[in-house]
Amino acid sequence: MINGSIVALITPMNSDGTVDYASLERLVEFHIEQGTDAIVAVGTTGESATLPMTEHAAVVCQTVKFASGRIPVIGGNGANATAEAIELTKSMQKSGVVAMLGVTPYYNKPTPKGLIAHYTAVAASTDIPQILYNVPGRTAVDMKPETVAELSSVSNIIGVKEATGDLSRVARLRELCGEDFLLYSGDDATAREFLLLGGNGVISVANNIVPHAFKAMCDAALAKNAQLAETIDQPLTGIYRSLFCEANPIPVKWAVHRMGLIANGHIRLPLTELSEQFHGLLIETMKQAHIEVK
């Protein structure tokens, strides 16, 4: 399965709010050229919460077509209603995605029993591998390692994206879930340590703007070359911080636009474009990371 540097891809949009497929194709080509190991289409960073189901599935399917077998694509299939998650999963069944990434149901705060029932039902609706996604800072529910361990026995649940930033969970998840269960970091600031502790990869926001360097860091960490990984990672720490000066994906979408990779930085309400007070911060950290700003 997929190890290494995985981009949580933004979804570019036209000024009228429709999806900008020309820019999306450009982004896919950019990540192929930069050596990114895989793409997550329409996850949190891809504005999944504001894409209706048919549009969500269409963006995932088109991303796979643009990739044309040259880079694996993982499709986001999270929803806070199990029936909706199943419907979304079925709509991508023949898309060509190599796996699906499903965030814990948000807002309604399911119990561990509810999480197990939810993910088991979604997994049963498809033969495509499923990756769990724990990000309590956004969902208000924390899926503990013990719950993940129970779900790891489901044949097509193959891994988890753990975005708490709690590095103690790496060893605990590995102990409970076994060596074959895939552990992905969802926190750029602690990703290097996550990999050195035994993680398999990183599903990254920063990878949208520093893919070559982020890939090099991941490769070094996976090879257990801690010194090289730190040397590559250190200049990126400012980027990691500045990309969360406002809610993701507001800053990263603005940054990708300033790189000239997408036609404009339109983002769907209730999110709004990056506040002017943060423009200077982001430009400065991008320049420090040797990113060309246009």
Curated annotation (Swiss-Prot):
Record-level GO cellular component terms: cytosol
Pfam families (UniProt xref): DHDPS
Keywords from the named record: Amino-acid biosynthesis, Cytoplasm, Diaminopimelate biosynthesis, Lyase, Lysine biosynthesis, Schiff base
InterPro entries: Aldolase_TIM, DapA, DapA-like, Schiff_base-form_aldolases_AS, Schiff_base-form_aldolases_CS
Positions contributing to pyruvate binding: T45, I203
The protein's annotated pathway: Amino-acid biosynthesis; L-lysine biosynthesis via DAP pathway; (S)-tetrahydrodipicolinate from L-aspartate: step 3/4
Any GO BP annotation: diaminopimelate biosynthetic process
Compartments in which it is found: Cytoplasm
Primary localization class, coarse: cytoplasm
Annotated EC: 4.3.3.7
Record site: Part of a proton relay during catalysis: T44, Y107
SUPFAM superfamilies: Aldolase (SSF51569)
Class of enzymatic activity (EC top level): lyase
Active site: Y133 (proton donor/acceptor), K161 (schiff-base intermediate with substrate)
Subunit structure: Homotetramer; dimer of dimers.
Similarity field: Belongs to the DapA family.
Protein name: 4-hydroxy-tetrahydrodipicolinate synthase
Organism, as annotated: Shewanella frigidimarina (strain NCIMB 400)
